[in-house]
Amino acid sequence: MYDGYISAIKKWLHNATIAIDPFHYMEYLTEAVQSIRRRVLSDESLYFQDKSWMNTHWRLLTTNPKNYPNKMMTLKSGMTISYYDRVYKFVQQDNELQYAFLKVQDIFYELNKLKQDKASNCFNFIIDSLASSTSKEFVECSKTWNHYKEYIINSFIKYKDRRLSNGPIEGINKRVKELKAVMSGYRNTKRFYKRIILVQNIEKGR
């Protein structure tokens, strides 16, 4: 989500479809939730039961419930509880934290079943709901999503039955970085660049 890249693509790749990968735009939403968590829990005037457990399991607040550990845990009290129930029990102690948790879970649910033809209306609704939130972190997220909305919606376009993704490009970048790590072994850069092209062509043939 960088305007410099978008400007370059528009200037040089006129027929390209610009799409922002879900990983990148969802990162803004999850960071907003975690920022709310940090702000709320830093208030020394508030007491939170099970705070120490949440401090080591904070990622669960912004994890899709379907990816939670599929097992039960036993508390010191002898009570058996699921991971989701323990997280939800914790966030219920603060209205803003509970709202943030439920909001991100609702968005996970909506996006998981969203199709391209409904993407525009769905994102308009989500952005409006974030913008009207009393949490400043969600308001900032809504501004960012609104700015890049066209490219976020494009991520739902399918090509060969797969959504547009920067996964293949990230894979190439990873290979280039690995080759750069051993670049000192080459006497000139021409051999290095030829090696990159060779590796990429071998991968294409598999």
Question: What spans do the regions from the language model cover?
Answer:
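Acidic/histidine-rich catalytic cores and adjacent linkers
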Residues: 3-15, 26-27, 46-206
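Inter-helix linker motif
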Residues: 17-31
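Short, surface-exposed linear patches
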Residues: 18-21, 40-43, 189-190
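Short, surface-exposed amphipathic charged segments that create phosphate/polyanion-binding patches used
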Residues: 30-42
